[in-house]
Design a protein with these regions (language model features):
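N-terminal amphipathic/basic helix or basic patch
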Residues: 7, 11, 25-28
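Short, contiguous pre-domain boundary segments
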Residues: 12-17
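Basic, low-complexity intrinsically disordered segments
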Residues: 44, 55-58, 83-88, 92
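C-terminal structural segments of small proteins and small subunits
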Residues: 64-91
Length: 92
């Protein structure tokens, strides 16, 4: 991934860590974070299902307009922390 792409993901991760951003987190931004962490996406109607080899957790997201649901933002944040998916980056 290009450096500019990594910088964008770092900024999105900073927003994801903030509880203030849960209600106004763009669905496409949450999707970009998961894809940058090597999750595979499968779409079935309005459900975007993300899986990753080596991780048993399945992430199921449904957009509400252009936003992600707040509880799903929290789930993604906790999944990333629990599995230490950010490598050398600050994961809170």
């Amino acid at each position: 991934m290009l450096t500019a792409g990594l910088a964008r993901i770092d900024k999105l991760w900073d927003r994801l860590q903030s509880r203030f951003g849960e209600r106004n987190f763009a669905f496409d931004d949450l999707r970009a974070i998961l894809l940058s962490l090597s999750f595979d996406e499968r779409v079935r109607r309005s459900h975007h299902i993300f899986t990753r080899s080596g991780i048993a957790d399945i992430v199921n997201l449904q957009p509400v307009g252009r936003l992600a649901k707040p509880y799903q933002v929290r789930q993604v944040r906790e999944l990333i922390r629990r599995h230490g998916l950010l490598g050398g980056r600050d994961d809170g």
